[in-house]
Amino acid sequence: MNEYVTRNNPAIRITMMPRDTNAHGTIFGGVILSYIDTAGAVEAIRSTGHERFVTIALREVVFHEPVFVGDMVSFYAKTLKVGNTSVTVRVAVEAERFGSHEKEVRVTEAEVIYVAVDEQRNKVKIAGEKHKKE
């Protein structure tokens, strides 16, 4: 179990497919980064109630273990900070390796910063939205 949410409630959960592999036969890191961005955005929306964000930074990305075809990968997210216009989210990535002795392995983690925008992509304040405090 991780420190973000219960095992049954990741922001997203994906089974990795052969189309996502790199030249070494493991899942391409860029695919994982894309899902980290998606999971973080889901959390930003859930924690603030604001529906439109853009990613401005992906920080402290650390790849601990490779991800393999067939792994069921869970992306757990937690809001770290809600500012006037931005939200900082921590995403932890765990892979469930079927047919292995290991149940769930922490494979990656990252911190992502989003900025709230309007329909014209102008920065807007989050004030007045619901702020989930944990």
What are these regions (language model features)?
Residues 2-6, 10-12, 68-69, 80-134:
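HotDog/MaoC-like acyl-thioester-processing domains
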Residues 31, 57, 62, 76-78, ...:
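Residues located in well-ordered beta-strands
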